[in-house]
Amino acid sequence: MTVNRLLLLILPAAIMVAAMILTSGMEHRLAALGTTVQAKLMLGRAGLALPYIVAAAIGVIALFATNGSANIKAAGLSVLGGGAAVIIVAIAREIIRLNGISSHVPAGQSVLAYCDPATMVGAAAALFSGIFGLRVALKGNAAFATGGPRRIGGKRAVHGETDWMKMQEAAKLFPDTGGIVIGERYRVDRDSVAAMPFRADEKQSWGAGGKVPLLCFNGSFGSSHGIVFAGSGGFKTTSVTLPTALKWSSGLVVLDPSSEVAPMISEHRRQAGRKVIVLDPTASGVGFNALDWIGRHGNTKEEDIVAVATWIMTDNPRTASARDDFFRASAMQLLTALIADVCLSGHTEGEDQTLRQVRANLSEPEPKLRARLTKIYEGSESDFVKENVAVFVNMTPETFSGVYANAVKETHWLSYPNYAGLVSGDSFSTGDLADGRTDIFIALDLKVLEAHPGLARVVIGSLLNAIYNRNGNVKGRTLFLLDEVARLGYLRILETARDAGRKYGITLTMIFQSLGQMREAYGGRDATSKWFESASWISFSAINDPDTADYISKRCGDTTVEVDQTNRSTGMKGSSRSRSKQLSRRPLILPHEVLRMRGDEQIVFTSGNPPLRCGRAIWFRRDDMSASVGENRFQPENKA
């Protein structure tokens, strides 16, 4: 217990009791001030009630003085205790007085009929002060009335009457039995700590967070996909990734750029009977063959080979120059030809049909590679391979050099043994993900994602296609929980999963830092409309961008408020004043109010429902989650 909290717990009650004691006996002094019998009697009665009224007033003043404090609940308890002490003293004094006159009460009358009205008034004042203290002790700062314009509903709401979703409706829409954690079922802006900022290391700032039921999504409506926008340091991992990884009960793929989720969650998932795989470049011996799914479950090998080539070659949703577009398209065709040669020509053993072998073939000296392409064209058993190689056989050396340089650049990451091992290994198969009991954590840090996005694109694309190609023949749904997804760049398979993934057992939860990241990765402002149209829920929190705040304000809608207006006019004959009430339009939440939201508060949008303003499920505030989470490598000394 801090010193401030201890002082607030003791001082108000002590001052209330002291004031009551010090003002006792004032009835004689006040009565002496009267000049008539009636005045002396009235002042004497007031003096009897004065000690208790003064104590009650001090309690109320103390509560208003501590309004906005993090320890206001302690002050409320103190005022409650002080009010109770004052009432007990008043009752005790009155009992003693009545006991003294009980022998003189006429027969047939109750001694209670002689209770002093002044003392009763004073005790009532102390009672109401104690009730107010109890309210503050329970609700904190939320016990005080909040100022704001009066909202109008019904026929008079000419400018709109949008409102926040009620928590009862939110509980029906997002029951706590779901697997994807959305947030917590309470209004942060109405909590006792709403006036102070959220601090992870100050439990006093948490308020009701961590003690209320969860809001979870069970995929019952919409596409089942979700999008999260939260700024840097906005508790994305602690409020979305970790809680969802704890609750999700089916197949799970997590892109973990911080490499902290897997160590904290793996043991919990294993205890639930799940197979946990961590794809970490620093750990040798763990990897899968990114080409093992090609041609399975009814799809043609040629289509799948082209898909792999598009993942390696970073797609660009924006129009590039004709020259750049030619070399990139030709480089992708060269990669397609080399992958097809490894998989279809028939001269490569099954265990060697990997991307590592493709890179080995590509990294030969340019003249030797041209000779290999000629040999492939002449001896391949696949017409598809021949058709893709044919264009390079008689290509001019200068043009081929440009194509070769592009292909080598895009596959450069396959030269690193640890990166190549992740997509050319045999410790597990992509088919393992379809059984619904396999979890894969992709522990690629931001440096790797920035320098070699093709690595993560190949991993995620292979796992997505391994599920997609099964045409829904999977156990349960597989959740792809992708943090820092903008680092992957434009990935067409994600758009395919977005539009048709629900039917094939794929659920996406994608985490961005801002709208700008999404627009940069997926092609300007049109990207937001495409993704928002296909998302079941969209969450915004920890917003620092004014453009994003303006978008949220507009999407929340408008309300009609009643505004008091006063007009003053001054003339030669005097002045006049008139008052009127007007109906005006006001956004449900203004952009600057969005920017001022606490870090543990979010706004969630769903189709066909009012906007939801609720808390965030930060794992270290919840005892049920803290007990299941392992040590955080960034905070080894403290779990929280």
UniProtKB/Swiss-Prot annotation:
Membrane topology, record value: Multi-pass membrane protein
Alphabetized Gene3D superfamilies for the sequence: P-loop containing nucleotide triphosphate hydrolases
SUPFAM superfamilies, sorted: P-loop containing nucleoside triphosphate hydrolases (SSF52540)
Cell compartments where the protein resides: Cell membrane
Biased composition, class Polar residues, residue ranges: 562-573
Annotated transmembrane regions: 6-26, 46-66, 72-92, 118-138, 212-232, 440-460
Chain spans, region Disordered: 562-583
GO cellular component: plasma membrane
Keyword annotations: Cell membrane, Conjugation, Membrane, Plasmid, Transmembrane, Transmembrane helix
UniProt similarity note: Belongs to the VirD4/TraG family.
Protein name: Conjugal transfer protein TraG
Species name: Rhizobium radiobacter
